[in-house]
């Protein structure tokens, strides 16, 4: 079963930041500078975590993966032109 996740990161080195960004572009929808919305299976989530661990320096970088409830409402304040299909938005 596929579940939604919010992946947020703070990478201290520009090279690692670019590598994580390029990797994440293939995994989810880029919704803010260092934030991606992903819909993943358990296997895809596990593989994504393993790959991210290879790309970051665990002492200096911070990556957080938040599970989101299915069918959750999303509030977008400000410019909201980056909403993925299937995500409901209320104003």
From Swiss-Prot:
Mg(2+) binds at residue 10. Keywords: Antiviral defense, Endonuclease, Hydrolase, Magnesium, Metal-binding, Nuclease. It comes from the Bacteria. Coiled coil: none annotated. GO terms for biological process: defense response to virus; maintenance of CRISPR repeat elements. The keyword Metal-binding applies. Its EC number is 3.1.-.-. Its cofactor is Mg(2+). InterPro entries: CRISPR_associated_Cas2, Virulence_VapD/CRISPR_Cas2. It holds the Pfam family CRISPR_Cas2. Gene3D superfamilies: 3.30.70.240. HAMAP family: Cas2. Belongs to the CRISPR-associated endoribonuclease Cas2 protein family. NCBIfam families: cas2. Homodimer, forms a heterotetramer with a Cas1 homodimer. CRISPR (clustered regularly interspaced short palindromic repeat), is an adaptive immune system that provides protection against mobile genetic elements (viruses, transposable elements and conjugative plasmids). CRISPR clusters contain sequences complementary to antecedent mobile elements and target invading nucleic acids. CRISPR clusters are transcribed and processed into CRISPR RNA (crRNA). Functions as a ssRNA-specific endoribonuclease. Involved in the integration of spacer DNA into the CRISPR cassette. This is CRISPR-associated endoribonuclease Cas2 2. The lineage of its organism: Bacteria, Pseudomonadati, Nitrospirota, Thermodesulfovibrionia, Thermodesulfovibrionales. The gene is cas2-2.
